[in-house]
Swiss-Prot record:
Keywords: Allosteric enzyme, Glycosyltransferase, GTP-binding, Magnesium, Nucleotide-binding, Transferase. Catalyzes the conversion of uracil and 5-phospho-alpha-D-ribose 1-diphosphate (PRPP) to UMP and diphosphate. The gene is upp. This is Uracil phosphoribosyltransferase. The lineage of its organism: Bacteria, Bacillati, Bacillota, Bacilli, Lactobacillales. 5-phospho-alpha-D-ribose 1-diphosphate binds at R79, R104, D131, P132, M133, L134, A135, T136, G137, G138, S139, D200.
Length: 209
């Protein structure tokens, strides 16, 4: 069973409070989501494999450590997931970036896939699937289905806010996936929004309604 981890670092929690506030404007929301994503990436990447490398410092030769093999692929679920990409790239600038496009039917709350574009070597990379919200879990499940179908196996799901319903659904469908979130909230409301949540992350990131 993959692990479920709430990242409770004080800076993450402080910044999460900023973006939860309904008075947080688009510019601030976007900037702080970027900052939270960088902080979360530090913990999510903790188990990346290392290998020895012989180098020479100004003083002496030594055996140092470097990342081993293929590195990370970041795969945002469009459109809100885009807001988390740059923050992770600041920490892992060599990462490749794929995209999976989803939209949610407002009546059924079911996700529909409309676009998939991934690095050709996705099966050799550690994949961070990013989406600010894990609500019903439908989009996350479908995105991970698409990744596994194309050969990915080392997958982590990273979100800012999650609902118990979404966590349960994702763990039941993909029990091998590690889930990282900045907060586990109370529940979903009748419209499929996380309560207390932070509203529609995509609209708040891009200034749309």
């Amino acid at each position: 069973m993959g692990k479920f981890q709430v990242l409770d670092h004080p800076l993450i929690q402080h910044k999460l409070t900023i973006i939860r506030n309904k008075d947080c404007g688009t510019r601030s929301f976007r900037e702080v989501v970027n900052e939270i994503s960088t902080l979360m990436a530090y913990e999510v990447s903790r188990d990346m494999p290392l290998q020895d490398k012989t180098i020479e410092t100004p003083v002496a030769k030594m055996t140092a450590k470097e990342l081993a093999g293929k590195k990370v692929a970041i795969v945002p679920i469009l459109r809100a997931g885009i807001g988390m990409v740059d923050g992770i790239l600041e920490l892992i600038p060599a990462a490749k970036v794929g995209h999976i496009g989803m939209y949610r039917d407002e009546e059924t709350l079911q996700p529909h896939e409309y676009f998939v574009k991934l690095p050709s070597d996705i099966g050799q990379r550690q994949v961070f699937v990013v989406d600010p919200m894990l609500a019903t879990g439908g989009s996350a499940i479908m995105a991970i289905d698409a990744l596994k179908k194309r050969g990915a196996s080392n997958i982590k799901f990273v979100c800012l806010v999650s609902a118990p319903e979404g966590v349960k659904a994702l763990r039941e469908k993909h029990p091998d996936i590690d889930i990282y979130t900045a907060a586990l909230d109370d529940r979903l409301n009748e419209d499929g929004y996380i309560v207390p949540g932070l509203g529609d992350a995509g609209d708040r990131l891009f200034g749309t309604k």
